[in-house]
């Protein structure tokens, strides 16, 4: 097994509970949406987010809001929705209403890898890169802002869908100084882990409280960890 020089992390169900996204972030975005649309609809600041939506849904505040509610009810991971969600969450993070509840092992282990092993830590999530940076810039730990510990960020726009092998190849190609076999991808999603492995990365399933139950087949096929501490020093 090649040494690990880059750890690539999923977010939801890996570094923080799925419930934070489903029960805190999503409702916050829905609650903030009507007021934001009313206040920002014609502003240059909001124009890129509005323009990214399909024309048939971007003609009125009511139409756009209805489309957002529909997409979120189906948990569809569409890039223009993810970008808008990040925009809506920004106010909540900045004013202290939102703080990302990282699992207790995450920040200490990230610091350990970075400081003692020289390992690069990067993020790959279906949430937009701006939303990722808001989350890691406003955690419930000390320090709250751990962005300086992270070397790069990937989403479905700059990398591609998370269940496709080509997305992991594209990510590794951006950092050619690290051979793809020296990357470790950690995720709660079995199909993402399989795609990363097909691309040539090492990959483990992270089994956190609140995550979907893993099949016996998945447990046999892949290494499963409950905490980053199980990985130890790299």
Swiss-Prot record:
Belongs to the HAD-like hydrolase superfamily. MasA/MtnC family. Gene3D superfamilies: 1.10.720.60, HAD superfamily/HAD-like. Keywords: Amino-acid biosynthesis, Cytoplasm, Hydrolase, Magnesium, Metal-binding, Methionine biosynthesis, Nucleus. Its EC number is 3.1.3.77. InterPro entries: Enolase-ppase_E1, ENOPH1_eukaryotes, HAD-like_sf, HAD-SF_hydro_IA, HAD_sf. It is an enzyme of class 3 (hydrolase). Pfam families: Hydrolase. Disulfide bonds: none annotated. Substrate binds at residues 125-126, 162. The lineage of its organism: Eukaryota, Fungi, Dikarya, Ascomycota, Pezizomycotina. This is Enolase-phosphatase E1. It catalyses: 5-methylsulfanyl-2,3-dioxopentyl phosphate + H2O = 1,2-dihydroxy-5-(methylsulfanyl)pent-1-en-3-one + phosphate. Pathway: Amino-acid biosynthesis; L-methionine biosynthesis via salvage pathway; L-methionine from S-methyl-5-thio-alpha-D-ribose 1-phosphate: step 3/6; Amino-acid biosynthesis; L-methionine biosynthesis via salvage pathway; L-methionine from S-methyl-5-thio-alpha-D-ribose 1-phosphate: step 4/6. One of its GO terms (biological process) is L-methionine salvage from methylthioadenosine. The gene is utr4. It is found in: Cytoplasm; Nucleus. GO terms for molecular function: acireductone synthase activity; magnesium ion binding.
């Amino acid at each position: 097994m090649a040494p690990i020089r880059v750890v690539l992390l999923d977010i939801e169900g890996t570094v923080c509970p799925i419930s934070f996204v489903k029960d805190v972030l999503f409702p916050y975005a829905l609650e903030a949406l009507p007021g934001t649309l009313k206040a920002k609809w014609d502003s240059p600041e909001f124009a890129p987010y509005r323009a990214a939506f399909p024309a048939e849904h971007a003609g009125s505040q009511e139409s756009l809001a209805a489309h957002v509610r529909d997409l979120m009810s189906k948990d569809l991971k569409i890039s223009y929705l993810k970008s808008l969600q990040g925009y809506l969450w920004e106010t909540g993070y900045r004013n202290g209403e939102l703080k990302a509840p990282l699992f207790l092992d995450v920040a200490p282990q990230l610091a350990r890898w970075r400081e003692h092993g020289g390992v690069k830590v990067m993020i790959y999530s279906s949430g937009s890169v701006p939303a990722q940076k808001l989350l890691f810039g406003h955690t419930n730990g000390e320090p709250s802002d751990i962005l300086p510990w992270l070397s790069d960020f990937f989403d479905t726009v700059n990398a591609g869908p998370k269940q496709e092998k080509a997305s992991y190849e594209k990510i590794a190609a951006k950092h050619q100084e690290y051979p793809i076999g020296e990357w470790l991808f950690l995720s709660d999603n079995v199909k993402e882990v399989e795609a990363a492995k097909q691309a040539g990365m090492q990959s483990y399933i992270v089994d956190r409280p609140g995550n979907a139950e893993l099949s016996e087949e998945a447990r046999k096929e892949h290494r499963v960890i409950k905490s980053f501490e199980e990985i130890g020093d790299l």
